[in-house]
Amino acid sequence: GCVDTLTFGSETGDTAPLMHCAEYLHSDVFNSDIRPEVAKGVSFAAARTEAVKKALGAETAELLTKPNCILGIEYCKAILSLNSNIVPQTVQRIAIDHDSDKAHGAFASSSLIRSKSAEGEEISSYVPENTAVCIRALQKEKQYPASLSYLDRAVLAAVSAMPLEDLRRVPDVSEGIENRILAAAETAETCTGLFDAVKTKRYSHARIRRIVLSAYLGITNDLPNLPPYLRILGMTSCGAEILHKAKPMLPIIARPADVKKLSLEARRVFELEVRADNLYSLCTEHRRPANMDYTEKLIRI
């Protein structure tokens, strides 16, 4: 390939401690250290933080409480897993925290921006003008914002009717959590109500949400861990040059016709991607036509 640097934001602004933490999390030592922590009945995230604290100290463990640092550590772990020569670099997040409900000058979290735009408030001072224009256009077409509440009954009906064995094949399902999900689906009135009812110390709200939506979409744990293709949604002339020079390690989808060239396994993943896009469109007041992934053209800038 022709990528030599990966740049991402983080609360620390220093790559070294992120990579140090990633190296430990990528090691057999960590796999051994975390077992007694998980046995205490806490969530994986809490067990991981405690293992890091004991092995590397409180300062490094503190990184696992910061959302952007967590993501940066995962990037570093991926680089280690792939034995890649890519060098990670981080830019420090400033002014406001992840998911902050308050703005600071021209800075606002993405959560606050989504909240303000959903309520019809002006957001142009927090985003580039082109972004504001796109959001206004989507709002005019009633295709923004999206809310899972539009699908509450459909999701609950699908999950409650799902055989127990099928639910066990969904990623992240273990330790009998599928029984709690099916029981809650019989009485919950909303998806949020279902998530709240199933949540435990070990199973976070986010994890339950992933399980339920994966079940609804038909995502199972036998899918490949890595994507079986690269999908190009848009590119500049510079991007086209990079793709031309890059050594293709995976099939590239740049046009709808390219899907026909995929293997059966890759095509199955693409069909799930299409299903997820269709689901998203159903979460807006005015839905887009289904299966637009097969018709939309590559964006060239």
Question: Where does each model-flagged region fall?
Answer:
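Active-site cores that bind ATP or allylic diphosphates and position pyrophosphate for catalysis
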Residues: 1-301
